[in-house]
Amino acid sequence: MVAVEQSEASRLGPVFDSCRANNRAALIGYLPTGYPDVPASVAAMTALVESGCDIIEVGVPYSDPGMDGPTIARATEAALRGGVRVRDTLAAVEAISIAGGRAVVMTYWNPVLRYGVDAFARDLAAAGGLGLITPDLIPDEAQQWLAASEEHRLDRIFLVAPSSTPERLAATVEASRGFVYAASTMGVTGARDAVSQAAPELVGRVKAVSDIPVGVGLGVRSRAQAAQIAQYADGVIVGSALVTALTEGLPRLRALTGELAAGVRLGMSA
């Protein structure tokens, strides 16, 4: 098991504490930087803040997105064709912070390596970012990131899945700070009609070894689904459905975010 120093308190901890005090889950929304273009993506992210999203996941578009579903893959491809850069993501984080929101970055690891791990952590913290979600990085290979996250007081959000062995899950949870990202279905992301029944079991496995908050993602697209997941998870993560809504325009994005924000407050009464 990887040895992890936890010298800093979680930056996202107060968000989950506040939500828990209000007997609800946090709404965590993902959008990629640069879709449909950089200014419009920043406007969309600030709209999420204004519409009730507790944490914004700011995506770094990447040319080989192995875990993204078709909706997000199409959006990130369009962003890359438009010339989006990692620095645009940092600017988006700063805009979210100025708007009163709380931002984390979600990125495959290669763009961070190219930027420089410590430099990225430094610049993310300077922009007001609170942490980093790293879907293709495992703690055993994250020594540079573990050190940089301590140096720059950033949360580190690793992924667990139904296929995670008990040993892998325990090591991942120990290395995480802020929350753990529970992938509620196997395979790529994307909105779906039925939320995975594996998700409650996976959250229970995390809760058995830690009190760290757990966010469940991969598939939520409705108020009822958000309410369902809010019964057992600390955070409800929505990505593809928000990207689809943005394709239809900011009013639709605001409306869906409001519906989802109501869902995380409703529980199973939705």
Swiss-Prot record:
Catalytic activity as recorded in UniProt: (1S,2R)-1-C-(indol-3-yl)glycerol 3-phosphate + L-serine = D-glyceraldehyde 3-phosphate + L-tryptophan + H2O
Q: Enumerate the GO terms in the molecular function aspect.
A: tryptophan synthase activity
Against PROSITE patterns, the record matches this protein to: TRP_SYNTHASE_ALPHA (PS00167)
GO BP terms: namely: L-tryptophan biosynthetic process
PANTHER family referenced in this protein's UniProt entry, alphabetically = TRYPTOPHAN SYNTHASE ALPHA CHAIN, CHLOROPLASTIC, TRYPTOPHAN SYNTHASE, ALPHA CHAIN
The alphabetical list of record keywords is: Amino-acid biosynthesis, Aromatic amino acid biosynthesis, Lyase, Tryptophan biosynthesis
Q: Which domain of life is it from?
A: Bacteria
Spell out the catalytic residues. Answer: 57, 68
One Pfam entry name: Trp_syntA
State the EC number(s).
4.2.1.20
Query: Which InterPro entries does its entry note?
Result: Aldolase_TIM (IPR013785), RibuloseP-bd_barrel (IPR011060), Trp_synthase_alpha_AS (IPR018204), Trp_synthase_suA (IPR002028)
Q: What is this protein called?
A: Tryptophan synthase alpha chain
Q: What else is known?
A: Was identified as a high-confidence drug target.
What organism is listed for this UniProt entry?
A: Mycobacterium tuberculosis (strain ATCC 25618 / H37Rv)
- Which pathway does it serve? Amino-acid biosynthesis; L-tryptophan biosynthesis; L-tryptophan from chorismate: step 5/5
Give the gene symbol.
trpA
The record's function comment reads: The alpha subunit is responsible for the aldol cleavage of indoleglycerol phosphate to indole and glyceraldehyde 3-phosphate.
Assembly description: Tetramer of two alpha and two beta chains.
Q: Name one GO cellular component term.
A: plasma membrane
NCBIfam families in UniProt: trpA
Question: Belongs to which family?
Answer: Belongs to the TrpA family.
